[in-house]
Amino acid sequence: MEGSDFLLAGVLFLFAAVAAVPLASRLGIGAVLGYLLAGIAIGPWGLGFISDVDEILHFSELGVVFLMFIIGLELNPSKLWQLRRSIFGVGAAQVLLSAALLAGLLMLTDFAWQAAVVGGIGLAMSSTAMALQLMREKGMNRSESGQLGFSVLLFQDLAVIPALALVPLLAGSADEHFDWMKIGMKVLAFVGMLIGGRYLLRPVFRFIAASGVREVFTAATLLLVLGSALFMDALGLSMALGTFIAGVLLAESEYRHELETAIDPFKGLLLGLFFISVGMSLNLGVLYTHLLWVVISVVVLVAVKILVLYLLARLYGVRSSERMQFAGVLSQGGEFAFVLFSTASSQRLFQGDQMALLLVTVTLSMMTTPLLMKLVDKWLSRQFNGPEEEDEKPWVNDDKPQVIVVGFGRFGQVIGRLLMANKMRITVLERDISAVNLMRKYGYKVYYGDATQVDLLRSAGAEAAVSIVITCNEPEDTMKLVEICQQHFPHLHILARARGRVEAHELLQAGVTQFSRETFSSALELGRKTLVTLGMHPHQAQRAQLHFRRLDMRMLRELIPMHADTVQISRAREARRELEEIFQREMQQERRQLDGWDEFE
C-alpha cells in the first residue's frame, strides 16, 4: 500500500467503527461483533473499499500485542508461577484433545492426514483478542473461570512455536538434520532478552521518568512493546508472547500503572482494527459455494471445543455456574490459524479450497462467540435470578427495593450488610457469577447480570427505588451507569465508589456529589489513631481528621477544571500550608479539658 492508500484505509476503518459499533451496541450484539460486521461491509466481499486484507491483518495483530503487554503488567512472576498447573495442565490438555478430535473429523472428509493434523491444531486454538475482550466485558477477569481461561490462552501462545516447526516436518520439506547452531543462537537471544529485561528495564524507565516529559515516557513504552514484538518475530516466536513477557518483567515496577495508561488508547484502537480485519478476510465466495459444509463445520468446531473445555473445567473443579462461561468464551477459532494455515499452504499441504474453507470456518466461529455468550448470560440469569427455593430465606421479600446496590465485592458487601441490618429493602446486581452463587447460599438477594443494561435495571426495581449505590471495579462501568441512571431514572439518588481522585473528579463533573473514595476514609481513620499514639488527645485528633476531610474535599472541587500538573502541585502546596495554619490557630485558641475523651477508643 502507498501512503495515500494507508490514509484512506485509516479513514475507512474509523468510519466503519464509528458507524457500526454504536449500532451493534444498541442492537445488543456487542462491540466485537460490530467490528466484525463492519469489516465484512468494507472488505473485498462487501462494498470492496479495501482489497489488501493480508497486509492490514498482519499490521492489526499489534492490537493483540498491546493487549498481551497490559495483561503481563497485571501478572507478576510469582502469580504466573501459581498458574503453572492450569497453564501446562488444562492448557495442554485442551490443545491436544481438541486438536486430536478435530483432526480426526477432518480426516473423515477429503483432507490428507498431514493437512488434517495442521487443521486440527489450528482450529484448536482460540482467539486471544476476542476471549480476553469478552472476559473483561463479562467481569470474568478475577473469577476462577477467567483465570483458567487466561491460562489456556497463554499455553496456546506457547504452543505456536512447536506448531509452526511441525509444518515442514509434515510436508516432508524439513532438512535431514536440524541446524543446532541456529537453534542455540535463538535460545541464547531469548535468554538474553529475559536477563536484560529483568535488570535493565527499570533503570531505563527511571532515567526517562526523571526527564518529566510525559510524551517521552509514552514513546519509550511504545518502543518497548514494538521492539519486543519485532525481536520475538525475528526469532520465529510469537510477538504476543514477547510483549507479555516484557509486561511481566515490569509488573512489580513502580511504573506499572503509568505504562498501562500510556498503552491503553493504542490497545483499544488496534484491537478494533484487528476485528475489522478479520471481518474483511471472510471469503463470502467460498461461503456461498460451500454453504452447507461451512455451516456444519462451524457448528462442529464450536461444539467440540465447548465439550472439551466443559469437561476439563469439571475435572479441574470449576464451579458448575462458571463452566459454561469458560467453555463458551474459548469456543471460537483464533487468529493463529491464519498464520499456521498460510504457512501450511506455502508448503503445499492443502489442496483446492481446503485452506479457504478452514479460514471461513474460523472467521464465522469468531462471530458466533458474542452471540453464544449472550445465550449463556440469559441461561445464567434464568438459573440464578429465578424465584428462590422454598427452603431459602432471602433477606428481602419485597419486589420494590428501596436501594439497588451494583457490585457485591468487598466494598459492596459492607454497604449491603449495613443496609440489611437496618431492615432496608435492597436488591444487588453482580456480573461475577461465582460471587452470585456464593452470596445466594448465604441468603443474600443477589441477581446476575450487567447493570449497564437498562432492561435489567428496570426489572431490578429501579423505577420504584429511592437510591442506587454503584460499587463497580472499573471506572468506565461506573461512569456509564451514572449516565444511564441520569437519563432513564432521574429520580434515583446516585451514590458511587471512586477508586481515587481522578474518578472522584469525573463523578463531580457528572453531577454526582455523594461518593466515597475507597481508601480515603480508612486512611484518615488510621491517621487519627496514629495521632493519638503520638500523644495527641483523642478529641483533638478527631477535630484534625474532620478539618483534613473538609479541606481535601474543597480542594477536590477546586481542582476539577485544572489539568496541568504544575497547577495541581502548586495548589496542593498551598492547601498544605492552609491546613497547617488551621491546626496552629486551633491549638492557640482552644482550651479543652483533656479528660473529656479518655474513653474515646
From Swiss-Prot:
Keywords in alphabetical order: Antiport, Cell inner membrane, Cell membrane, Ion transport, Membrane, Potassium, Potassium transport, Transmembrane, Transmembrane helix, Transport
Record's bilayer topology term: Multi-pass membrane protein
GO cellular component: plasma membrane
GO molecular function (one): glutathione-regulated potassium exporter activity
KW Transmembrane helix (keyword) present: yes
RCK N-terminal domain sequence ranges: 400-519
InterPro entries for this protein: Cation/H_exchanger_TM (IPR006153), K/H_exchanger (IPR004771), K_H_efflux_KefB (IPR020884), Na+/solute_symporter_sf (IPR038770), NAD(P)-bd_dom_sf (IPR036291), RCK_N (IPR003148)
Top-rank taxon, per record: Bacteria
GO biological process per UniProt: proton transmembrane transport
Record localization: Cell inner membrane
PROSITE patterns linked: RCK_N
Function: Pore-forming subunit of a potassium efflux system that confers protection against electrophiles. Catalyzes K(+)/H(+) antiport.
Subunit structure: Interacts with the regulatory subunit KefG.
Name the UniProt record assigns to this protein: Glutathione-regulated potassium-efflux system protein KefB
UniProt source species: Escherichia coli O139:H28 (strain E24377A / ETEC)
